[in-house]
Amino acid sequence: MSLFSAKSKPAEVFPFTLTDAEWHARLSPEQYRVMRAHGTERACTSPLNAEKRHGTYNCAGCGQALFTTDAKFESGTGWPSFFQPMNEHAVGTTEDRGWGMVRTEVHCGNCGSHLGHVFPDGPAPTQQRYCMNGVSLDFQPA
């Protein structure tokens, strides 16, 4: 089933949904700006950049497991980076034509919250760099 947005294009329907008021109540102002309004946190501001413990990175909006430390790498970009999600359903992607460029936006596969972008310049085995906003992630140590 699909719905139509104000721009008359199909909008994806996600298993976990909340009203805008419920998202505002659930998320901090910065999380809402990034996750629901497709913002970007400043580089090098997330404590998750330096996180070295084993564990899982979940969506800060709905708790969906997204990435593990086994896929995390130091990209030098200032954002937590991973070479692959936990599984094919963890995240989704859409084309992002904002800011005068074409990028691939990454969102939570369960609630649709904006997580970051994926670029084709990561390490083996995928050559992908999932560049995530730390504020969109909730780290759970193993």
List the predicted regions and their residue ranges.
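Short, contiguous pre-domain boundary segments
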Residues: 1-20
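A short Gly-Trp-Pro
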Residues: 14-142
